[in-house]
Amino acid sequence: MAQRNGMSPRPPPLGRGRGAGGPSGVGSSPPSSCVPMGATSTAGTGASAAPTATPGHGVHRVEPRGPPGAPPSSGNNSNFWHGPERLLLSQIPVERQALTELEYQAMGAVWRAAFLANSTGRAMRKWSQRDAGTLLPLGRPYGFYARVTPRSQMNGVGATDLRQLSPRDAWIVLVATVVHEVDPAADPTVGDKAGHPEGLCAQDGLYLALGAGFRVFVYDLANNTLILAARDADEWFRHGAGEVVRLYRCNRLGVGTPRATLLPQPALRQTLLRAEEATALGRELRRRWAGTTVALQTPGRRLQPMVLLGAWQELAQYEPFASAPHPASLLTAVRRHLNQRLCCGWLALGAVLPARWLGCAAGPATGTTSPPAASGTETEAAGGDAPCAMAGAVGSAVTIPPQPYGGAGGSAICVPNADAHAVVGADATAAAAAAAAAPTVMVGPTAMAGPAASGTVPRAMLVVVLDELGAVFGYCPLDGHVYPLAAELSHFLRAGVLGALALGRESAPAAEAARRLLPELDREQWERPRWDALHLHPRAALWAREPHGQLAFLLRPGRGEAEVLTLATKHPVICANVEDYLQDARRRADAQALGLDLATVVMEAGGQMIHKKTKKPKGKEDESVMKGKHSRYTRPTEPPLTPQASLGRALRRDDEDWKPSRVPGEDSWYDLDETFWVLGSNRKNDVYQRRWKKTVLRCGLEIDRPMPTVPKGCRPQTFTHEGIQLMGGATQEPLDTGLYAPSHVTSAFVPSVYMPPTVPYPDPAARLCRDMRRVTFSNVATHYHYNA
């Protein structure tokens, strides 16, 4: 560029120069095209040479799409739609929670300009105005993008201050509109624009916001809810927005954006998606589909079976209800708790089991095989509309064709390819042959048992409940709480139980949170940075405290992942928990690059170091171990998680041994509402008013609830036939012997006085005074409100 008036040439503005998202050669940061050639991907894709862009400022040649796994090429991020980065990021399977190293660097290269502009709120607003119209990928789920949009062009946002929903953030700026691809099979009105940026759907009312430290939020305008998608850039590049449940709601999503729960039987799909009311749906499920097993797809985790329930009492066949002292009384107490929480009629859809029960051979719990003709459900549907079997085991050789879903319910025939994506328009003959090779019908929990789980009882990780307003909730027997899962059944078939895996990440006004029964905020995630985000550590190197240095640190090639992936091919233990070992390798590599002592960082965060016993070093090959250069023999344990994060991890990993840390405290709120709501007899506004009144009366206290899974060292809870808890259950205190002496008087002068034990009163009015520890102002107000 020639000089003007003797002045030096002006550098290109941020995000407009050569390279994806910023000027090339700034600091030690590699350009967007400098993706390591030897990067290893768990998807099994190889790396190829990166194409080069045409030199020149603002002029870029459209590169042809490369094969899956090709490294991203250089080019402006506005050219992302025609670049190989889009093809690379569209190969992420639904089951995978984290991105590979190659996909991680592609995300960082595309989001480079936004990261470098993330210094102040004013700089972010200028960036959104300068790069308006640019498409940026959200990583997970694939097919979703952020279209950079100035706030003045966002319809309906107005002067909304997002800091009211997150007061601890210094600033939060809305920068983009969330859009997604539309499948022509699900929405025929799209036509030829299905593969064009103009054919993207922007009707969800979702906006992307960025905060200080590159905290990423998704703002739901319709519900006035702020959702925390990522706490820093490292988490955003690694996981994307895949944990945001709201993204999966739009009914214009097609078969491949993203893949949903597989329902091979069209009759069952029509029953679930086209039921006008919960009463008719419950009647149809009990009559025809009771005991049918569905392979439930949740983004970011493996398939897991969900057994459709015909009656509430069927839960007595699953743990933890089967091992309770009185399963019928416990189920009555849980049903009473659901009535109190939902404040309306509801329907139990099914029990979600761990993934190890998926695809087991049909037969009772002892491992024997029963003939399929013994099922009454199959006999009823012998006319050609039999209920579907399980959709297939993970890794099974049987190919099960996924079916279209959503509001439109198209008729495209799809088969899964090697990357677990749906290919629209496949051969109908092959799909019919795959459907004919499906497993036999499995009914009930006994049909789930096989040789791998012989002699055991399935454990219900979640009980899926549908209220009469159409919303889907999940009752968790692990901690006894009710969590919102989806806004409707079609949303549930796309998002699965993701709402219970990412708890405490939605911030909404009190009335909105009470209406949707949102859980409490996880303050650890909202107010504190991640302990392993070492690039934000205050004792990190000086070069890592400015944006260019941080980006170069995050996108540097080789963070210890190649060694772990090599060992995973030889050791089954590492292969089973490869994500944990990859995370440990990244932490060790990051600490070494930043000059931090990982053991000190872990202990400051509340964790500890586990020292493995190894042989004494002998010889030159072990000199590095003696000098402490390698820390493979000392693996740090993570600091203790919050109760919500711990529960989410247990549900994601099917940890059947997880137990809550404590029981509800003595000051917990005891709901005295005994109303039984008839299904289909309540109005929407009345239900919302009941939930809001109970939230006001509770005053933020913990809810006293049945605990099917009691903490360690506690006795199981006991209930009456009406579901009323008897005193003395699920407590960590020793048993009361009946001997009582005042503590301020010496026992030598005052003899022990025998006091009779507490007698439970079946009368609701007398039960109010059975234990003064539970009588608070909110309890009394609730009692008079519902019993006046």
Swiss-Prot record:
<keyword id="KW-1083">Inhibition of host autophagy by virus</keyword>
<protein>
    <recommendedName>
        <fullName>Protein TRS1</fullName>
    </recommendedName>
</protein>
<comment type="similarity">
    <text>Belongs to the herpesviridae US22 family.</text>
</comment>
<keyword id="KW-1035">Host cytoplasm</keyword>
<dbReference type="Pfam" id="PF02393">
    <property type="entry name" value="US22"/>
</dbReference>
<dbReference type="GO" id="GO:0052170">
    <property type="term" value="P:symbiont-mediated suppression of host innate immune response"/>
</dbReference>
<feature type="region of interest" description="Disordered">
    <location>
        <begin position="1"/>
        <end position="82"/>
    </location>
</feature>
<dbReference type="GO" id="GO:0140321">
    <property type="term" value="P:symbiont-mediated suppression of host autophagy"/>
</dbReference>
<keyword id="KW-0694">RNA-binding</keyword>
<keyword id="KW-1102">Inhibition of host PKR by virus</keyword>
<feature type="region of interest" description="Interaction with host EIF2AK2/PKR">
    <location>
        <begin position="672"/>
        <end position="788"/>
    </location>
</feature>
<dbReference type="GO" id="GO:0030291">
    <property type="term" value="F:protein serine/threonine kinase inhibitor activity"/>
</dbReference>
<dbReference type="GO" id="GO:0039580">
    <property type="term" value="P:symbiont-mediated suppression of host PKR/eIFalpha signaling"/>
</dbReference>
<keyword id="KW-0945">Host-virus interaction</keyword>
<feature type="region of interest" description="RNA-binding">
    <location>
        <begin position="74"/>
        <end position="248"/>
    </location>
</feature>
<keyword id="KW-0899">Viral immunoevasion</keyword>
<dbReference type="GO" id="GO:0030430">
    <property type="term" value="C:host cell cytoplasm"/>
</dbReference>
<keyword id="KW-0946">Virion</keyword>
<feature type="compositionally biased region" description="Basic and acidic residues">
    <location>
        <begin position="651"/>
        <end position="660"/>
    </location>
</feature>
<dbReference type="GO" id="GO:0042025">
    <property type="term" value="C:host cell nucleus"/>
</dbReference>
<feature type="compositionally biased region" description="Low complexity">
    <location>
        <begin position="26"/>
        <end position="56"/>
    </location>
</feature>
<keyword id="KW-1090">Inhibition of host innate immune response by virus</keyword>
<dbReference type="InterPro" id="IPR003360">
    <property type="entry name" value="US22-like"/>
</dbReference>
<dbReference type="GO" id="GO:0019033">
    <property type="term" value="C:viral tegument"/>
</dbReference>
<dbReference type="GO" id="GO:0039502">
    <property type="term" value="P:symbiont-mediated suppression of host type I interferon-mediated signaling pathway"/>
</dbReference>
<keyword id="KW-1048">Host nucleus</keyword>
<comment type="function">
    <text>Inhibits the establishment of the antiviral state in the infected cell. Prevents the phosphorylation of the host eukaryotic translation initiation factor eIF-2alpha/EIF2S1 and thus the shutoff of viral and cellular protein synthesis by directly interacting with EIF2AK2/PKR. Prevents stress granule formation in response to eIF-2alpha/EIF2S1 phosphorylation, thereby rescuing viral replication and protein synthesis. Also inhibits host autophagy by interacting with host Beclin-1/BECN1.</text>
</comment>
<keyword id="KW-0922">Interferon antiviral system evasion</keyword>
<comment type="subunit">
    <text>Interacts with host EIF2AK2/PKR; this interaction retains EIF2AK2 to the host nucleus and prevents its activation. Interaction (via N-terminus) with host BECN1; this interaction inhibits host autophagy. Interacts with the viral DNA polymerase accessory subunit UL44. Interacts with host HSPA5.</text>
</comment>
<feature type="compositionally biased region" description="Gly residues">
    <location>
        <begin position="16"/>
        <end position="25"/>
    </location>
</feature>
<dbReference type="GO" id="GO:0003723">
    <property type="term" value="F:RNA binding"/>
</dbReference>
<feature type="region of interest" description="Disordered">
    <location>
        <begin position="610"/>
        <end position="663"/>
    </location>
</feature>
<keyword id="KW-1114">Inhibition of host interferon signaling pathway by virus</keyword>
